[in-house]
Amino acid sequence: YDLLPYLPALAGEVIGSAEASDRFLDDWRLTLGELITDNLYGQVGRIAHEQGLTTYFEAMENSRPFVGDGLAPKCKADIPMAAMWARTQTLNFTQKMFLEMQADLMESASTAHVFGRKQVAAESFTAYGPSQGDSLVYGLYPAMLKRIADLEFACGVNRIVIHESAHQPIDSMVPGLSLDIYGMWFNRLSTWAEQARGWTDYMARSSYMLQ
């Protein structure tokens, strides 16, 4: 149908009737979602495959949803991906931010089940630095992070992608360089780096068994 007469509905005007306006707005949002899915995620996937690359699409996360079906962009990925931050709000399993991220994990797992993907990835343990006022900062350690990893596994994730491990060229610059304000700060200068093997083995073995 002709789009032009209904455009004022985007500014809150009722065109024809409330029902007709709502139906137009539903069509509008659905179309935007389809265009973004096909022309961004679909196109990137096609180009990547032409170059023999595997795609991970961390589409929408918890607080950046665009209009459309959440599974649609993720199904364009070879490995659908979610995110789970290591923040004070997410370590408290009742906080709204935690619940939103849990939904993102489960949405990615659902995408894998519906579209036949064998792996579900998650950007894991992302944290803010001091400038954002999070009290955790460099205080994150494996016993604390295990709660998040176990939650990811329980929600269907089977490939943990640790965020982040910046290159550390200067031994004396402790606790090390970072990705701007973002952690967690997983590198050889961490105070528990030499004791990390049990933790990394746990994540690797759990991921392998779940895959």
Give residue ranges: language-model regions.
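Carbohydrate-binding surfaces of carbohydrate-active enzymes
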Residues: 1-80, 85-211
